[in-house]
Amino acid sequence: MPRYKVFAAIDLGSTEITMKIAEVSKKNGISVLDTVKYDLSIGKESYAVGKISYNLVDKICNCFEEYLRIMKSYGVDEYVCYATTAVREASNSEYIIDQINIRTGIKVTIISNEEERFLHNKAFALNNSYFDDIIEAGAVLVDVASGSVQVSHYEQSKLQFSQNLPMGSLRVLENLSTVKNSTTSFSSVLEDFIKAGINNYKNVFYKNPNYKYFVIMGNQVRYITVSYTHLRAH
């Protein structure tokens, strides 16, 4: 009997398709062997027109066919493939996953926002030993994605509430795409739009301003970090 298994996890996201391949064993836990990313702005089309075109589905299938070859080279035993906001909100989502399955054999599971954020928080907890300490002291976890932002409030180790804001980076840009071409101060419009969304959230949900910890995470954080570093440098 082998002492380990090789798993693959595919994330069909709003801006990229990511695959991680990992070796899992009782002795060593999870060891990531490879991470592969393919940039594909599915959300840009989904958020703008409410559906995903056949041309884009074709690109997804081509990517998955390459991922299958990579999985075979690693001897992957099992895989999961999750689709998130961009596919979930597309009016032709069932057609998309059917086409992927017919062409590649890959079974795609569309997960809910709640399932997606639960997995993100669980991954954060597993990778950060201080998680239990900060949620005991009081913490706000902000999960920034392309389609939305999830804000979760913890006190005394319990989740008090969690709210989803449709203010993901890509969705906001798509919502304001017509304004962008008709103004010379788009950055100000963008700032006002985001502030309005945050203020609405604070007025309705934000009851305790004394949380000790504020944690920001998600696949869009790296862009925020780069932007902040650029501003500091200038």
Residue ranges and their predicted role:
Residues 2-29, 136-161:
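Gly/Thr-rich phosphate-binding beta-strand-loop-beta motif of the actin/hexokinase/Hsp70
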Residues 15-54, 157-186:
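Short glycine-rich, Thr/Ser-proximal phosphate-binding strand/loop in the N-terminal lobe
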Residues 34-126:
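N-terminal phosphate-binding loop and flanking beta/alpha elements of the actin-like ATPase fold
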Residues 65-78, 128-132, 200-212:
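Phosphate/pyrophosphate-binding loops at sites that engage ATP/ADP/AMP, CoA/4′-phosphopantetheine
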Residues 76-85, 210-220:
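Short glycine-rich phosphate-binding loop at a beta-alpha junction
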Residues 176-217, 224-225:
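ATP/pyrophosphate-binding catalytic subdomain of soluble kinases
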Residues 229-234:
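Conserved small/polar residues in nucleotide/adenosyl-binding loops
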